[in-house]
């Protein structure tokens, strides 16, 4: 099973009001859930996400890759920046969905890459409220070589084309 099926397995058994997803290569700061709870008390959303960043202990190559993946220059701010060229789509490295969302739109599909973007697109299409919690960041470990990073970006490019076939509005220049 891939990441989508594993997350669905957990969601089918979850009993809480929200299902929270992280990637296995993320480090969650101790204040994360307090930050999310404070935000949800002020403004209830059905789907939320937060940014990812480099931990101070990461290697120089990981920090460089992180910059290329989180800077406005590298992504147009689409990965959780207050400044963005497009709509914010929560991604499963740092994402929470309400039980109502899961029961209405279902879980993640079986795409190997991009299953989280597909879910976020379906959540928007169903009319649910989506929010960015900028202070609910995670430390996301990056690839340790340029070769591994290239492979990751290549796979994401394939995913972007597949997502464009499922959701034409997602296939755009950023």
Predicted regions, residues:
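Short glycine- and hydrophobic/aromatic-rich loop-to-beta-strand nucleating segment
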Residues: 87-97, 117
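Conserved nucleotide-sugar donor-binding
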Residues: 15-16, 94-105
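The conserved acidic donor/metal-binding loop of glycosyltransferases
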Residues: 23-27
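Short, flexible, basic/aromatic active-site loop/helix in glycosyltransferases
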Residues: 50-56, 65-88, 103, 161, ...
């Amino acid at each position: 099973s891939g990441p989508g099926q594993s997350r669905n397995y957990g969601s089918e058994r979850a009993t809480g009001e929200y299902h929270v997803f992280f990637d296995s290569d993320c480090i969650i700061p101790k204040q994360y859930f307090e930050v999310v709870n404070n935000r949800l008390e002020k403004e209830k959303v059905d789907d939320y996400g937060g940014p990812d960043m480099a931990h101070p202990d990461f290697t120089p190559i990981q920090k460089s890759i992180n910059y290329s993946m989180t800077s406005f220059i590298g992504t147009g701010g689409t990965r959780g920046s207050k400044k963005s060229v497009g709509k914010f789509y929560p991604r499963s490295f740092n994402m929470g969905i309400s039980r109502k969302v899961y029961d209405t739109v279902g879980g993640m599909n079986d795409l190997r890459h991009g299953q989280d973007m597909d879910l976020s697109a379906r959540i928007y299409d169903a009319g649910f409220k989506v929010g960015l919690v900028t202070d609910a960041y995670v430390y996301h470990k990056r690839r340790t070589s340029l070769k591994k990073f290239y492979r990751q970006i290549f796979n994401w490019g394939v995913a972007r084309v597949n997502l464009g076939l499922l959701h034409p509005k997602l296939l755009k220049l950023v």
